[in-house]
């Protein structure tokens, strides 16, 4: 039997082995219906019951209040970034964007054809090594919403607290940190998250939105681009990615069985601490310049003394069963992604490899 490696990919990311094994066992026949879950109608009583159960489990996992709709939509976060202004900003209105890394810049770019953009804070001036202090943010007077990216996978910075933006709706991309730590959903008006990091496979996106927001007119658009239409049809306005939805449900059940978000917050802090300690105690052989208060627990970028060492590290790590550690092309270096499904044993193996590599080449 082939041994599974430790997969540090930033997304699509490692999935819990129990989830994969259950999906494997149910591949040919699910729930005694005589067919795979990916073969049955999304409008069948069996699948509708499955979908309702998954929503209930996700609400339990994240503590989603009743006055929020939970949507399961095709695609990923980038699609939502374009849909936000179409749904919630009137023509000619301004939206505020907090820029803390590559993905918040992407969100701004996707929204810019449909809304006037005000950059309230820009971490690029400091190389995205810190999150600009809230006291210096330049919020608009009548913004349609404020947008933030909770965790930046490439630059490795993370909001540890929810920023106070007053009465303006706060929208957040939680793709890479949803269910990784406890959050108060009620402090946000809309949360969106591509599933492929902590919630399941690529191809499905969760949107959690305050129901009163769905009453906004926004801009002219088709029903398929309208959150209210998806909410009215229980995320089945069009044929949904049923197998992805099913896998997301298995992943959520696994997280609940393991102790919920509180337990994963504990695990994630412990895993990240192991890697950061190894970096900080390496005498400069490994470098991470992110301000300590905003260091990401999900994505840890670091650099060796030169690009040749970076390449050697990634290649030897792969040979040692540590996959996908090469940094993003935008910044280079090395990146370890430690999502919920990454076991402590994988992080311990990485840290042991880091020590060994430094002994041999440091």
UniProtKB/Swiss-Prot annotation:
GO cellular component: cytoplasm
Catalytic activity: O-phospho-L-serine + 2-oxoglutarate = 3-phosphooxypyruvate + L-glutamate; 4-(phosphooxy)-L-threonine + 2-oxoglutarate = (R)-3-hydroxy-2-oxo-4-phosphooxybutanoate + L-glutamate
Similarity section: Belongs to the class-V pyridoxal-phosphate-dependent aminotransferase family. SerC subfamily.
Organism from which the protein derives: Xylella fastidiosa (strain Temecula1 / ATCC 700964)
Modification N6-(pyridoxal phosphate)lysine, positions: 197
PANTHER family: PHOSPHOSERINE AMINOTRANSFERASE
Top EC class for this record: transferase
Gene3D superfamilies listed in its UniProt record: Aspartate Aminotransferase, domain 1, Type I PLP-dependent aspartate aminotransferase-like (Major domain)
Predominant location: cytoplasm
GO MF term set: O-phospho-L-serine:2-oxoglutarate aminotransferase activity; pyridoxal phosphate binding
Source organism, top-level taxon: Bacteria
Pathway field: Amino-acid biosynthesis; L-serine biosynthesis; L-serine from 3-phospho-D-glycerate: step 2/3; Cofactor biosynthesis; pyridoxine 5'-phosphate biosynthesis; pyridoxine 5'-phosphate from D-erythrose 4-phosphate: step 3/5
Keywords: Amino-acid biosynthesis, Aminotransferase, Cytoplasm, Pyridoxal phosphate, Pyridoxine biosynthesis, Serine biosynthesis, Transferase
Pfam assignment, any one: Aminotran_5
Protein name, entry field: Phosphoserine aminotransferase
Record text on subunit structure and interactions: Homodimer.
Cofactor-binding details, from the entry: Binds 1 pyridoxal phosphate per subunit.
Sites where the protein binds L-glutamate: 43
